[in-house]
Amino acid sequence: MLVLANVFWGLSFPLIKAIAFEHLQLLPASSSWFITACMLAPRFVLAAAIMLVWRRGALRGMTPPEIRQGVGLALFAIVGMVFQNDGLQYTSASTSAFLTQIYAILIPLWLALRRRRLPPAVVWISCLLVLAGVAVLARFDWRDLKLGRGEIETLVSSLFFMGQILMLDRTDFASNRPVPVTVLMFIVEAAAAFVMIGVTAPRLADVPVLFTSVPWVGFTMALTLFCTIGAFTIMNTWQPRITATEAGLIYCLEPLFASFMALFLPGLFSHWAGFAYPNETLTANLLVGGGLITAANVLIQVKPLPRLTPLTPAEARR
């Protein structure tokens, strides 16, 4: 099931770029932060509304641990997506998708630090492969030691996605029901995104203009149904059944789907909406960098990790 979540998230990368292109056609003076806020707010309002209709009474009888987890997941996710979506406007969909996977390195290292235990050799080898892949994919300049804005923001977003995965791994949340947690997460994310609209909008009167565009609404609906409701429901339901390290590395499949879809979806989106978003191509950097990151995931799956005990409440609060 987590593979299906990766398919949906892979679709989100070309979709988000398409929404940004359509937004700029409608409101050319918009900042990238305002564009990001306008992507996120309707996405999570729709997701919360659909879930509340589909699962009536989902929020009834929520326990304190479910509330804490829902709010925590929302905060990690919304901050991560703000940086990821803004960064995606300054780099390609494929590059963003692969760089997001830096949490594949951070999760085992973080768990080792918290538990004062060294990860097995296979984790270190995989980490080196991912680091090399990131350097190649981002065209890292070793002389100036600089990355572009899009790449930096994407790497920052990965820190928050790591926090989201680790929160699902906590033992004090093991008995939580995934549906109420997911619905609350969507509501908190929607509220945060609306605050961001208020802060970044040149004029609030500009916002309704977006809803006059059939392509913008269509892209947003697809992002909501597949990449939000579908992907997050699957993640919150199935990811707690495996270790955080295994989950982080399984999610390395996401950029493979994103890169594949970025080869043909931009042209289809452009034809429908009337903007110029060219199909991406398989460059040497993408093949080598993406291949190294994918190899790290394959290595972990071929040689499975010993299952670590999830973080206890005391460990999580340290």
Question: What does each model-found stretch correspond to?
Answer:
Residues 56-96, 136, 224-242:
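Specific transmembrane alpha-helical segments of multi-pass solute transporters/efflux pumps
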Residues 7-10, 14, 45, 74, ...:
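Hydrophobic/small/kink-forming positions within alpha-helical transmembrane segments
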Residues 1-4, 30-53, 68, 124-132, ...:
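Hydrophobic alpha-helical transmembrane segments of multi-pass integral membrane proteins
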Residues 1-38, 75, 79, 83, ...:
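Glycine-/small-residue-enriched transmembrane alpha-helix faces in small-molecule transporters
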Residues 40, 44, 139-140, 245, ...:
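C-terminal-most transmembrane helix of multi-pass membrane proteins
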Residues 27, 84, 103-125, 256-284:
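C-terminal transmembrane-helix exit sites in multi-pass transporters
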Residues 25, 33-37, 82-100, 177, ...:
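Structural motif at transmembrane-helix junctions in multi-pass transporters
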